[in-house]
């Protein structure tokens, strides 16, 4: 019995110390292709911050259209798209309706709101319709501006409450 136990312990010790060598290969790949970069933004968490559409400061009533243009968070200029490759690249930009879906700025201290619109041209004739893609084309290696202009209609009626009015658009 002692011989059997000794033999079992020797075999068990041998099995524990036995190592098997396994070799193989892993393929490693990279494909670099035509791509585009968006300029004029900063990243905050996992969200790009493209800039601010700042209509400035006014009294509770105003007679003229208030206008603004998005100033890039990174450069102070327009958002831009630059693509590499040899062919022109089409891309689209859509802008949502903001936090209340109707493009209104809300007073941070009351329920008062001010309606606004956003456009892709300085004349404010080409409206960014809510969630409707606008097409742009970029030429190889050249930055294509993605302008965002804003307008607020005159308010000659009931004065708006004093305070800050804010909204956030997703582009």
What name fits each language-model region?
Residues 4-12:
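Sec-dependent N-terminal signal peptides
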Residues 14-20:
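Sec/Tat signal peptide C-region and signal peptidase I cleavage site
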Residues 20-108, 138-171:
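N-terminal small/polar-rich segments of proteins
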Residues 123-132:
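Short beta-strand and strand-turn-strand segments in soluble, beta-rich domains
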């Amino acid at each position: 019995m002692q011989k059997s136990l000794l033999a079992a312990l020797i075999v068990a010790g041998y099995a524990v110390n036995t190592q098997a060598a396994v070799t193989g290969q892993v393929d490693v790949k990279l494909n670099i292709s035509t791509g585009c970069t968006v300029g004029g933004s900063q990243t905050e968490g996992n969200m790009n911050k493209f800039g601010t559409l700042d209509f400035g400061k006014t009294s509770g009533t105003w007679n003229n259209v208030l206008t603004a243009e998005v100033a890039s968070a990174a450069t102070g200029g327009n958002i831009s798209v630059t693509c590499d490759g040899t062919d022109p690249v089409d891309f689209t930009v859509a802008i949502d309706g903001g936090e209340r879906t109707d493009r209104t700025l809300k007073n941070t201290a009351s329920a008062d709101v001010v309606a606004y619109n956003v456009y892709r041209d300085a004349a404010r004739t080409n409206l960014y319709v809510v969630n409707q893609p606008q097409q742009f084309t970029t030429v190889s290696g050249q930055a294509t501006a993605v302008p965002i202009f804003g307008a607020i209609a005159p308010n000659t009626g009931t004065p708006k409450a004093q305070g800050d009015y804010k909204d956030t658009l997703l582009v």
